[in-house]
Amino acid sequence: MPRRSDLHRILVIGSGPIVIGQAAEFDYSGTQAIKALREEGYEVILVNSNPATIMTDPEFADRTYVEPVTPEFVEKVIAKERPDAVLPTMGGQTALNVALALHDSGVLAKYGCELIGANARAIRVAEDRKLFGEAMEKIGLRCPTGRTVTSLEEALSAVEETGFPAIIRPSFTLGGTGGGIAYNREEFETIVRRGLDLSPVHSVLIERSLLGWKEYELEVMRDCADNVVIVCSIENLDPMGVHTGDSITVAPAMTLTDREYQVMRDAAVAIIREIGVDAGGCNIQFAVNPTNGELIVIEMNPRVSRSSALASKATGFPIARIGAKLAVGYTLDEVPNDITKTTPASFEPVLDYVIVKCPRFAFEKFVSSDPGLTTQMKSVGESMAIGRTFKEAFQKALRALETGRSGWTIAERLQDDRLTEGSKEELRGALRRPTPERIFQLKRAMLLGMDTKELYEITAIDPWFLDQLRELIDAEQWYEKLTGVDAVSMRRMKRLGFSDRQLGALRGQSESDARAERWALGVRPSYKMIDTCAGEFPSSTPYLYGNYDEESEAATEGRKKVVILGSGPNRIGQGVEFDYCCVRAVLALREQGYETIMVNSNPETVSTDFDISDKLYFEPLSLEDVLEIVHREQPEGVIVQLGGQTPLKLTRPLEAAGVKILGTSPDAIDAAEDRRRFEAIARELGIEQPANGTATSVDEAVTIAQRIGFPVLVRPSYVLGGRAMEIVHDEVSLRDYFERAARVSEERPVLVDRFLEDAFEADVDALSDGTDVVIGAVMEHIESAGIHSGDSACILPPYLIPAAAVAQMKEHTIAFAKRLGVVGLINVQYAYKDGQVYVIEVNPRASRTAPFVSKAIGVSLPSVAARLMLGETLAEVGFTQEIIPPYISVKEAVFPFNKFREFDPVLGPEMRSTGEVMGIDDDFGAAFMKSQLAADNALPREGTVFFTVSDGDKPTAASLAGKFHSIGFSIMATSGTAAFFREQGIPVTSVLKVHEGRPHGVDKILNGEVQLLVNTPLGKHAQVDDEKLRQAAIANRLPYTTTLTAASAAFEAIAARRTREPVVRSLQEWHEILRAPGAVESATAGSTQPAGVA
């Protein structure tokens, strides 16, 4: 069938911020879908609140609305733009839930809008556990024994049928949020209550546990003519009980018999037909009983998913792109395969290689949280690797995680493998409970002589995988004993995925010595193409992976080449913002005629899409892998400053190996990162810093702290995301910090800074061509000093820091850029206190604010930076003047505290946010309100504000309580705070602290008597009370703030919401305002200063 001609305007709903369970894969999917629809001549409208995405850049969709992805705001966009259709399948669970809400409330019918890609019935039947179970029964397939319930009483009745352990799965949530495995009644009641609360329809499925069954996924596509293709099979290495996002996964499935696969395939085809997904793709999860092959259907996602992004990268079959074409009426045989250009999408992909995906976790950021892996997803990112065998791909995927392991290696310290003594008995206990370290504990168990049969009985990991892992140990032991290494034995080990570092360690060599030996033997990787057809048809897209076969399929062209190093797996501190920067650089350099070569290992991202760069190497970002690619490609140079800390760490070793680093020199990067060199430069430029010192021992740190005065900020050098950073108030706490968090030595110094309490902080992004410098933006942090810049909301342009101080920050930034010889991007962080500007740190690289600034000012900073690195000047690029918008942009952070309930959700100097959102409006209050709605922190319009604050905060809190009272809110406070408020004449209700008796503050929150919590940490003695309040707020989805500056901003937002409707404009319209004559000049003159919020 030809494309539908009755549709002209299509609204794509994005997924909003990066959260656990819904990450960069939806930027990738959405970007593909938008490109596919515009190719067909449709006008595309996008709603997405995440500024760090490529899809929200204004040139992708015709109209881009950076607005909250909520029914209310999507309705406003529909009312304004009047699209003919809504495509909800590219924005994860968020988009599906919003689309269904708009359908059910009659909004879509009112505006004559239809759902395409998946209709309302298909979404409802697939997502509603009860309806899905009934649909499976109708086609003769089994789901786990269980019952859908809407109350705790019903749940307790259901669990009598299923028994323990029981699985709890909430309906309509993402990443298993709110679900879990209960082994007893107490756990069961806790998880059910949470699941009912977090499910938008307040229903959960209670099902019989299938722990120990094997878990599989199929990616399936269907068109309007009822053609169905299976794109990819995926097998979870971990058995049922671990969320698929937290499991190591393998494609294609390895341990299914041919008959089992055919049964599963037939089931998948029957399922997609019965559910009614008739123009797009879906992901179907199955469990297989390892003893008799019995098949059970777990669930289906009627949309693109994390697994479909993985399947797309694994096969080269672009599921989202093809799904968008199917949604507008094409059939599979009418859509060409973009990789081969000669075969249609109705040809199922065939793999002649193996893919392994490994999840990346962030438990080090949430130390008190439970590292056990269950049905609720906890990983924050993932790596993918491609090899000729499972063993090769597995080791490469572990290396690509960038957690310090060079392959399947056990840690030097037992505690790093989550063990204390490493005995067989301890290992047996540890292996029964899935954690991120279990895969390494398995190696320890094998080295202690535990056999496959015993390990299978303990872990339920299929014996095939256990035997594959054992063969890696056998190979290590064989290699260790060789008297000499020749090319044959070296190639054998490389084909098993062993890195140079691993091979060196086995024979007492350094990594560089092992590499030199390998090169001397003439053993170097070849590169093969991913072509969707196992080499049956020629591939036109260079999408490559390294291996140690003799034959290479990578052709090298004669054009000038640039290698861009990506950022690897997403993690807290290094997220999709850096992928955005890499993609913008690639696109800018392609426009300038360069051959762009992307190196990355993250299957979720736009940068690893087959058509973004001229050539994609899907390889780990290790020195070994990058050196081999540079050796083969011989580029003009390598760009390291856009991918965060991952490529920056490679700067010095690459330079030492003779590789040209483009842009800012490695020496300048080192001068900014090395505290002693940086201090000397700041002194030379006459720029103030907080008093500080560098310690190489605990005693030295204590001496420095006593000299400069407590409180101090302590942190290791060369970290991203504030890793192991803390504010310390006394010597005892300082010594405790070194015991817990930081190993200190000459090679690993720790920085000790005087902490500037109650200072304002600001970020400045700028561009330099080596001679001239232009400010990109100055952003003021809403949270006060001491909270990591990545976790603080920020506003552009600044609103409380005096104009003279802002001007001084700009001057300092220009001075640093010139002194360091920056070519490309630079980010500088400042503090302002008592009339003095202090520099905190200088980063001569892309910062995580670059995408936000690019959206706010209408200029892509990374695109300009890439051209500067290749020798153009700011004047030649056309960016010669700072742009200060006449509107307000707010960036807000989004946190995963709902996944880590045991962790105290208080903000500090260590970054914990997973993503960000943006709010844009004409004034601060409305922009901040939008940012809170987008971050799922909806502020109340009325009700009770509960204050519990430290003594030093009481005067400011009283002023704020008075403001809330003046607009009709009731005020509640703990005794000390309440007494102070009464002295100021503020009506207030007293409430007990947790240790004072019942009913206390937590009871009030749990009973729904509080609509906003303002809680500033009260010091050690009240820590337990504080923590319980904040955890209750998280559990009850109650908006809360832990700083008074954020509470002031919340007041402004609530007041704005009560006085006017928010402005809904597309990004293109906001940028038109910038281009209006005199707009930027008037802004520069200070006309955009919003009302103060403190």
From Swiss-Prot:
Region annotation (Carboxyphosphate synthetic domain) maps to: 1-402
Q: So where does Mg(2+) 2 get bound?
A: 299, 301
- Oligomerization domain: annotated span: 403-552
What SUPFAM superfamilies does the annotation carry?
Carbamoyl phosphate synthetase, large subunit connection domain, Glutathione synthetase ATP-binding domain-like, Methylglyoxal synthase-like, PreATP-grasp domain
Could you name the domain of life of the organism this protein comes from?
Bacteria
Its cellular-component GO annotations read: cytoplasm
The segment annotated Allosteric domain runs over: 937-1094
Positions contributing to Mn(2+) 4 binding: 841, 843
| Cofactor, free-text remark | Binds 4 Mg(2+) or Mn(2+) ions per subunit.
Region (Carbamoyl phosphate synthetic domain) residue ranges read: 553-936
Assigned keywords, A-Z: Amino-acid biosynthesis, Arginine biosynthesis, ATP-binding, Ligase, Magnesium, Manganese, Metal-binding, Nucleotide-binding, Pyrimidine biosynthesis, Repeat
Which Pfam families does the UniProt record give?
CPSase_L_D2, CPSase_L_D3, MGS
Q: Which residues bind ATP 2?
A: 715, 754, 756, 761, 786-789, 829, 841
Report the sequence similarity comment from the record: Belongs to the CarB family.
Subunit-structure text: Composed of two chains; the small (or glutamine) chain promotes the hydrolysis of glutamine to ammonia, which is used by the large (or ammonia) chain to synthesize carbamoyl phosphate. Tetramer of heterodimers (alpha,beta)4.
HAMAP family the UniProt entry points to:
CPSase_L_chain_A, CPSase_L_chain_B
Q: What is this protein called?
A: Carbamoyl phosphate synthase large chain
Q: Which organism is it from?
A: Gemmatimonas aurantiaca (strain DSM 14586 / JCM 11422 / NBRC 100505 / T-27)
* Gene (UniProt): carB
